[in-house]
């Protein structure tokens, strides 16, 4: 089993791992009239490659908590696929976590697969950790989707872009962090307005108990 991890390069990560980061790739993503230059750095540990995407709008101190988070993570989702394709990385599965990665399945299906067959045999899995946080914004808040003449219904909910809903509807499979949570989010009380989309995907919804090895993953 070969596993790579692709993350945004936060300032805190760049400072912490600067001695171990190697510059891997530089490119410019061209989306209609938009050009986004970006760099990718690599850190390897225990046989796993960690790729960090760096570009002006994406790089911040914290993972989220900014007014332009949706725009930042729209770019992150697109640049992740742009990097994978341009570097010739082949994955059987792209595993996305929570709303920040919610547009990866959309871009793969509606943008990248429209212009090439590179991702033809790649499946997507989306894991819901917390359905409360959905990544909701206006189309005009986004750098890429705002350029498109038409936007699929899968992306929209109540006239807003909804990252979480997009991934639930488009991903090949959807998982949650436990069987209990998997059952709970099928009901309106727990689903934060997304229950009908979750129930519609119930044959592709799986509750998988997750956890952390606290002896190995100990920041102390």
Go through each PLM region and give its residues.
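Catalytic cores of nucleotide-sugar-dependent glycosyltransferases that transfer UDP/GDP/TDP-activated
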Residues: 1-220
């Amino acid at each position: 089993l070969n596993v790579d991890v692709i993350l945004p390069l936060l300032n805190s990560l760049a400072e912490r791992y600067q001695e171990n980061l190697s510059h891997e790739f530089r490119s410019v993503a061209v989306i209609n009239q938009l050009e986004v230059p970006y760099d990718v750095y690599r850190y390897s540990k225990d046989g796993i490659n960690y790729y960090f995407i760096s570009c002006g709008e994406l790089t911040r101190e914290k993972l989220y908590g900014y007014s332009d988070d949706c725009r930042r993570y729209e770019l992150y989702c697109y640049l992740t696929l742009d990097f994978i394709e341009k570097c010739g990385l082949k994955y059987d599965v792209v595993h996305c976590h929570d709303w920040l990665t919610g547009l990866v399945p959309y871009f793969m299906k509606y943008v990248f697969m429209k212009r090439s067959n590179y991702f033809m045999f790649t499946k997507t899995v989306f894991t819901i950790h917390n359905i409360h946080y959905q990544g909701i914004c206006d189309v005009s808040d986004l750098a890429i989707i705002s350029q498109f003449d038409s936007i699929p219904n899968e992306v929209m909910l109540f006239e807003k872009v909804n990252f979480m809903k997009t991934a639930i509807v488009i991903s090949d499979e959807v998982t949650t962090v436990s069987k209990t949570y998997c059952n709970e989010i099928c009901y309106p009380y727990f689903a934060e307005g997304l229950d009908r989309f979750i129930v519609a995907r119930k044959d592709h919804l799986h509750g998988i108990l997750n956890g952390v090895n606290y002896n190995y993953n100990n920041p102390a």
